[in-house]
Regions:
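Bacterial N-terminal signal peptides
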Residues: 9-22
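Flexible loop/hinge segments at secondary-structure junctions
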Residues: 26-208
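N-terminal secretory signal peptides that target proteins for export/translocation
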Residues: 1-6
């Protein structure tokens, strides 16, 4: 499996309810008078960072239990709106309808940014390949269907590509990463929109 980083990043936002989280009321090294449980959910992109933060915070705060479910940005926001979690992380900014449903005490803050990469596995091709922007747009839009397509071969002279179908692997849940990626595809040119594809957290990818 080889990956090709894309030259754009996505910002991860965190939603938090300021009520019901009494963790800021004691000083460094002090412990809360009662056990505190904090639940979060959302972005899979940010999950490794949350895991690290939670582990580091737990070292000096034995009375605080923090959990984070990496269920995707859309599901995380849904759980936060339903008051099922205390905070949620999303790679995509909230829609107006989602923002209207937030608790009054909710705040939204940027916490990190991440890169998105394309991963590919081509039998018989062990070298890194080049995929121009308009080419990978048409791959994900379903206009380029095989690895030996003339446009892929033209971008990679000297490489022998097999006459095999390109099998797309993409998120099937409500994902902020999908929203960021499809925004990128739509911004490159008209190919994405012209193919009838849309931008969003959950889309219908072309069937191979």
């Amino acid at each position: 499996m080889t990956s090709m980083p894309l030259r754009f990043s996505t910002l991860v936002m965190v939603l938090a309810a300021l009520t019901g989280l009494p963790i800021a009321s004691w000083g460094q090294g002090a412990q809360p008078n009662a056990a505190v449980s904090i639940r979060g959910a959302g972005s899979t992109l940010a999950a490794p960072l949350w895991k690290k933060w939670i582990e580091e915070y737990a070292v000096g705060h034995r009375g605080v239990s923090i959990t984070y479910d990496a269920v995707g940005s859309g599901e995380g926001v849904k759980r936060f709106i339903a008051r099922d979690v205390d905070f949620a992380a999303s790679d995509e900014i909230l829609t107006e309808s989602e923002a209207a449903k937030l608790p009054e005490a909710a705040v939204m803050l940027p916490v990190t940014a991440g890169m998105i990469a394309l991963a590919y596995n081509i039998p018989g091709v062990n070298s890194e390949i080049r995929l121009p922007r308009d080419v990978y747009v048409d791959i994900f839009a379903g206009a380029i269907k095989r690895w030996d397509d003339p446009r892929i071969k033209a971008a990679n002279p000297g490489l022998a590509f097999p006459h095999r179908d390109i099998a797309l692997v993409a998120r099937q849940d409500s994902s902020g990463t999908t929203a960021a990626f499809t925004k990128h595809l739509a911004a490159i040119g008209g190919g994405w929109r012209n193919a009838g594809m849309r931008v969003g957290k959950l889309i219908d990818w072309p069937k191979g």
